[in-house]
C-alpha cells in the first residue's frame, strides 16, 4: 500500500558513527543519536520506517558478519523495546570499488518499494547524514533531510515532518505573494503558524540554504520559488526574493493583534551575531558586518546587507543586525539564523491585544 515512508540511514543518523574506523563492530561502540527514540515514537503513526545502510566490506575479513550482528541486533532490540519497528532493513555490504548496483545512492535496494509503488513520493523522505543520502533522495524523486546533530537534529526533523497549527481561535496566518519583473519571477508562500519542510529554489544554492535557516529558526514554514536572470549575476534574484518575502511576512501578520512585536537575540554561535527587531510599521535598518571574501559559494557577500535591508523595508520593521568572527560562511549563516530566531519572538501570538498605544501598527 502506498504510504508516507522515511528511508533512514543507520550510522551517523540513528546511531553514532565512530570517526576512527567508521564501523560499529562491538557493543562498546553502540551509541544512539540524541533524542532519536522520542522522535521516532512521534513519527511512527505518520510514516513507515525503512532502514537503508551501506556497510563497507560486511562479511569479509575487514568486517566479519558476527562483529556487525551483535551491536546491530542490540540496537534493534532497543528500538523494539520502545515500540519502534522497521518495515525493512536494507544493507549493501559492498565497498565503493566493487561498483555494485545496490550501494547508496543507487536505488536497487529499494526496488520493491519502487516497483510496487509502496511509498508516497510527495510525503516520503530520506533521512541521513551524508551527501549520498541526499543523492539517494534525488534518485528516488523525494526530499532529503540531511541529519546533523547540531544543525538538523532529531527534534528539528520532527518539527519539519509533523506540521503544527496554532491553538489560537483565529484564521491561519498565511500569505502568498507573486512578484514578476523583467529580471525575476517569484512566488513566496508563508505559514506563520506551521512548521514543516520548506520548499526553496532560487538557483543560488547557498542562498537557498540561508532562506531555509530563516524559516527553520523562525518556527514557521515557507515555500520560495524564483527564476531570475542568473546569467548576469544573482543580484536581482536575492533582492527581489527579499522584497517578496518581506511583503509575504507583512501580509501574513495581518493586523498584528496578539503578537509580541519586539524581539532580540545576542549573542548567537561562535560568530557573536546579534539582532534586535521591532515590527513597528516604521522601516529602519542598521547593519554591521565585514567580510573578507567576495563570494561564499555562488552568493556574493555584499548581497547579505542588501537582502536584510530589502526585507526590513517591505516587512515595515526596525532591524538592527551585526556579527563578528573569522569565517565568512559562518558569519553570514549566523545573521540569517539570528534573524530567524528574533523573528520567531516577534510573531509569537500571546493574546489578542494590539501591542501599541497608538491603536495601530
UniProtKB/Swiss-Prot annotation:
Pathway: Amino-acid biosynthesis; L-histidine biosynthesis; L-histidine from 5-phospho-alpha-D-ribose 1-diphosphate: step 6/9; Amino-acid biosynthesis; L-histidine biosynthesis; L-histidine from 5-phospho-alpha-D-ribose 1-diphosphate: step 8/9
Protein residues bound to Zn(2+): 92, 94, 100, 102
Annotated region (Imidazoleglycerol-phosphate dehydratase), positions in chain: 173-361
Keyword Nucleotide-binding (UniProt): no
Compartments where located: Cytoplasm
GO terms for biological process, alphabetical: L-histidine biosynthetic process
GO cellular component, one term: cytoplasm
SUPFAM superfamilies: HAD-like (SSF56784), Ribosomal protein S5 domain 2-like (SSF54211)
Residues of the active site: 9, 11
EC numbers, comma separated: 3.1.3.15, 4.2.1.19
Pfam family for this entry, one: Hydrolase_like
Listed NCBIfam families: HAD-SF-IIIA, hisB_Nterm, Histidinol-ppas, PRK00951.2-1, PRK00951.2-4, PRK05446.1
HAMAP family assigned: Bifunc_HisB, HisB
The family this protein is said to belong to: In the N-terminal section; belongs to the histidinol-phosphatase family. In the C-terminal section; belongs to the imidazoleglycerol-phosphate dehydratase family.
Protein's recorded name: Histidine biosynthesis bifunctional protein HisB
Taxonomic lineage of the native organism: Bacteria, Pseudomonadati, Pseudomonadota, Gammaproteobacteria, Pasteurellales
